[in-house]
Amino acid sequence: MKYTVYQIRYTEAEIDGISAGSKSLKRDIRDDMAMDFRGEKMVGLVEIALNENLYTGVAEIEATCLDEVFQVGNIGPESQITRLGRMASISVGDLIEDEDGNRHVVANFGFKEVA
């Protein structure tokens, strides 16, 4: 099955702004996701990020399940990845969508379904 991976990516201008102390919704959401150890806020944060168009499609991965998507996105093999743009390793807050439109977010422990 083909899965699409979405990540919240920063532009160079956003990085410069954050470095200069500017507020950033992207950074706030990513920080909140990373600190949501119980996973209680994760889905709500993803919904905000989706509504604000903060996610960018970065890759399509051929895999049999979400765990394999996570593995391939972090250690390969590269032959199972079609890159759509600059991609970091798969981590907390990344969104994974299957061919049927089912979405899951990478949580601190496993995955959470996103409506």
Task: Enumerate the predicted regions with their spans.
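N-terminal intrinsically disordered, low-complexity, charge/repeat-rich segments that act as generic
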Residues: M1-G39
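Compositionally biased, intrinsically disordered low-complexity regions enriched in proline and serine
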Residues: T4-Q7, T11, R38, T56, ...
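Short linear sequence elements within intrinsically disordered, low-complexity coil regions
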Residues: I8-T11, I15, M42, E60, ...
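General "foldedness" signal
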Residues: G17-S19, R83, G110
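Short, conserved turn/kink motifs that form compact alpha/beta structural patches or helix kinks used as
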Residues: D36-L95
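Short, compact, well-ordered microdomains
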Residues: G85-A115
